[in-house]
Amino acid sequence: DSCSNIIQPLTPCLNYVRALGQFSDIDIQTIPEQCGISATLPPID
């Protein structure tokens, strides 16, 4: 899966965000920055 190398590093952060119950309120494009990860996510349709 070509996306696994992008998603895997984000997993701990996504879990943290979900734990806060705010996933739907956060712009997916800001997650790498918020998590201190230098990455560019493709647009999610």
From Swiss-Prot:
<keyword id="KW-0020">Allergen</keyword>
<comment type="function">
    <text>Plant non-specific lipid-transfer proteins transfer phospholipids as well as galactolipids across membranes. May play a role in wax or cutin deposition in the cell walls of expanding epidermal cells and certain secretory tissues.</text>
</comment>
<keyword id="KW-0813">Transport</keyword>
<keyword id="KW-0446">Lipid-binding</keyword>
<protein>
    <recommendedName>
        <fullName>Non-specific lipid-transfer protein</fullName>
    </recommendedName>
</protein>
<comment type="similarity">
    <text>Belongs to the plant LTP family.</text>
</comment>
